[in-house]
Regions:
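Structured alpha/beta reader/binder surfaces that contact nucleic acids or chromatin modification marks
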Residues: 2-198
Length: 198
């Protein structure tokens, strides 16, 4: 999918990241700030925007690949397929490209995936993962959108039909300065964030 420029401002964006619904719920509840990602089937890798993006919940493969004990309590039944509920957005504080599987266990306190699902994701196509440190924001009023067939498929990023306002919303959880230092202690210096399509 081609990600179009010019659809994000300081107050609104149409860019959205697809993620398992249980992980999205955990992020917006303050349970986690870390995602472990791989690009979709048609993507060369995982690109990272510098600006805000919506957290777009999906249910594909969630039950099969699994969330850990902290994440499992956020799993909800799949809603009607003709709507999507958007409850929050995020920015990326830092990203890391991880090539060493020995670094997976030290990350377990900060993400919501089972060890088996992380290892499967790491080994898919080529051994690597992108580690994301997010700053999530919860909308005061969630937005329900009609589903769009263009959102289907195995890709990480999509655009909503139109930009949605980012406010009113509030930051979820404590500041991530300490967590970033902890992750840098495991993974080293963070990567330079690049936009999708770069």
């Amino acid at each position: 999918m081609i990600l179009l420029p010019g659809q994000t401002t300081d107050s609104a964006t149409s860019l959205a990241l697809k993620e398992w619904s249980g992980v999205v719920e955990g992020l917006l509840a303050g349970e986690s700030r870390v995602l472990l990602r791989k690009g979709g089937i048609a993507e060369k890798g995982f690109a990272c925007p510098g600006g805000p993006f919506w957290l777009f919940p999906t249910w594909s493969h969630q039950q099969e690949q699994g969330l850990n004990n902290r994440g499992a309590r956020f799993i909800r039944p799949c809603p009607l397929a003709d709507t999507v509920r958007i409850a929050g957005w995020a920015t990326m504080e830092a990203t890391w490209t991880m090539l060493d599987p020995a670094l997976l266990p030290p990350l377990e306190p900060w993400h919501l995936l089972t060890r088996a699902s992380v290892e499967k994701r790491f080994q898919y196509r080529h051994p690597a993962l992108t580690v994301l440190l997010l700053r999530p924001y919860l909308l005061e009023q969630p937005v329900t959108l009609p589903a769009d067939p263009a959102w289907d498929g195995c890709h990480s990023w999509l655009h909503l039909q139109a930009p949605l306002p980012l406010q009113p919303a509030h930051f979820v959880g404590p500041d991530c300065g300490g967590l970033r230092k902890a992750l840098e202690g495991i993974l080293g210096p963070s990567d330079k964030i690049k936009p999708p399509g770069a």
